[in-house]
Design a protein with these regions (language model features):
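Short amphipathic alpha-helices within nucleic acid-binding modules
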Residues: 19-20, 73-78
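Short hydrophobic/aromatic beta-strand element in the GNAT-like acyltransferase core
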Residues: 46, 66, 100-101
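Short glycine-enriched loop/turn motifs at secondary-structure junctions
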Residues: 1-3, 57-62, 94-95
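Vicinal oxygen chelate
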Residues: 80-125
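Conserved short beta-strand elements that form part of the metal-binding/catalytic scaffold
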Residues: 28-62, 110-115
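N-terminal beta-strand motif that seeds the catalytic metal site of vicinal oxygen chelate
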Residues: 1-15, 63-65, 117-125
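Core segments of cupin and vicinal oxygen chelate
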Residues: 2, 8-47
C-alpha cells in the first residue's frame, strides 16, 4: 500500500482555482510550487491544482473529485452561504448506498461531497 495520495487537476486560472480550494472550501495549502498548489483534503489525501499548458491541458470531462464526509448537509449549507452554486441538492442514492451532492470548480471539474452509508466502508481512524 502507498503512503499518500495526490490528485492533480489542471487549470487555466491558477489564482482563481487556488482561491476556490483554499478560501471557499477551506482546504489548507501545504505546498506552493509556483505553477502548482497542493492542498490537504484529509490526513493523507491531497489535491493539487496546476497551471495548464499545451502539454497538460485542462480537461474536466470524465473527472469527479469526491470529498468524503459524514456532514454532507453541513458542507452544502456552508458552501452555499459562501456563494457556491450546486448542480444538485444533497440526496440519497439507493444503488450505491450513498448520500451526496455535486458542484463544479472554476474549471468545470465535478466536485462531489459524499457520505457512504454502507457499514463496510472503511471509516477514518
Amino acid at each position: 500500500m502507498f503512503d499518500q495520495l495526490v490528485t492533480f487537476l489542471y487549470t487555466r486560472d491558477l489564482e482563481k482555482s487556488a482561491a476556490f480550494y483554499g478560501d471557499v472550501l477551506g482546504l489548507p495549502l501545504v505546498l506552493d510550487q509556483g505553477a502548482c498548489r497542493i492542498f490537504k483534503t484529509s490526513p493523507e489525501g491531497f489535491l493539487g491544482v496546476c497551471r495548464c499548458s499545451e502539454r497538460r491541458p485542462s480537461n474536466p470531462e470524465g473527472v469527479i473529485v469526491t470529498l468524503v464526509t459524514d456532514d454532507v448537509d453541513g458542507w452544502y449549507e456552508r458552501l452555499k452561504a459562501k456563494g457556491v452554486t450546486f448542480d444538485t441538492t444533497p440526496e440519497g442514492n439507493v444503488e450505491y448506498n450513498i448520500y451526496h451532492c455535486f458542484m463544479k470548480d472554476p474549471d468545470g471539474y465535478q466536485i462531489e461531497i459524499q457520505s457512504f452509508r454502507d457499514p463496510a466502508w472503511p471509516r477514518p481512524t
